[in-house]
Amino acid sequence: MIEMARYQCMCGWVYDEDKGEPSQNIPPGTKFEDLPDTFRCPQCGLGKNAFRKID
């Protein structure tokens, strides 16, 4: 089984690899590192560099 991770933006919003991000057409199971460079936090608009992996 593949371990899915969660990443939290500085604003507090969490990207869950299990769920993806439907509002940006990111399907469930998409790894954070596979997100497009254009990915932005849907809450605050910051890019991938504003996220950190959480337990």
UniProtKB/Swiss-Prot annotation:
GO process annotations (BP): alkane catabolic process
Domain Rubredoxin-like: 4-54
Superkingdom of the organism of origin: Archaea
GO MF: electron transfer activity; iron ion binding
Alphabetized CDD domains for the sequence: rubredoxin
Keyword Zinc-finger: no
Cofactor note: Binds 1 Fe(3+) ion per subunit.
Disulfide bond keyword on record: no
Pfam families assigned: Rubredoxin (PF00301)
Binding locations of Fe cation: 9, 11, 41, 44
Keywords on record: Electron transport, Iron, Metal-binding, Transport
Necessary cofactors: Fe(3+)
Family: Belongs to the rubredoxin family.
Function noted in UniProt: Rubredoxin is a small nonheme, iron protein lacking acid-labile sulfide. Its single Fe, chelated to 4 Cys, functions as an electron acceptor and may also stabilize the conformation of the molecule.
Protein name: Probable Rubredoxin-2
